[in-house]
Amino acid sequence: MLGTGTPRLNPDRSGPSTAIVVGDRAYLIDFGPGVVRRAAAAARKGFPALEPPKISVAFLTHLHSDHTAGYPDLILSPWVFGREKLDVYGPEGTEEMTQHLLMAYRRDIEIRTNGMEKKPPLVVHAHDVRPGVVYKDDRVTVKAFAVPHGEWPQAFGYRFETPDRVIVISGDTSPSDELVANCQPCDVLIHEVQLPSYNVETMPDWPAYRARYHTTTDQLAELANRAKPGLLVGYHNGGTEEALRDILQQIQRTYRGRVVVARDLDVF
């Protein structure tokens, strides 16, 4: 779990980003603020596949800024230190965002390739994808499925099938029957979760917003009882340690399976 936070400016919780590591390869999902340095930290903790120049395949669940603000860093920094190419898969708009970022950093890229550094060309292949199998290699098969996230016309969850595990990641979503179907079966479900009281003081319309965009503790417990993952991992919450304990306790009121609430750099 590279980043488990929200748009809240919590220095202990980077923006949403998850890595699936299969042997010597890492597959990145979402690029919240701080993603590249969190990957470097994970590499130091025993996951060399997460050395940033080695990350070459990545996926976006949707294009909210808290999930994409680290994208320029992911494009540029690993390239500066030797990455050969990057393939990025995501909903409609991923290609457009990538093109605009490359244009925004055009002068930097030109100086690094044509100046004294003599960097090789920056190669980024962005792919707008639709639900279904979007990526496959000899380690993993990745399936995208649609999830409901407010006004976003496309938001995805992903199902990763590896030789020994099936991992499902929700992205941002309100409760989703499609997600439950994609957990049949799954070893690990990584799902966003929000306290019902989160943001109420500063955002009076939060309950209405949350109902369309996110999943509460009680809703996640109900969903997990249907999905039956081997392990449920809650993420994408920006609260204090007390809030994390509250989230766990509220889920456990009605869900008896294995469940944890993730912190940055946790490993499962």
Describe the function of each predicted region:
Residues 157, 164-166, 174-266:
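Cap/insert and terminal regions of metallo-dependent hydrolase folds
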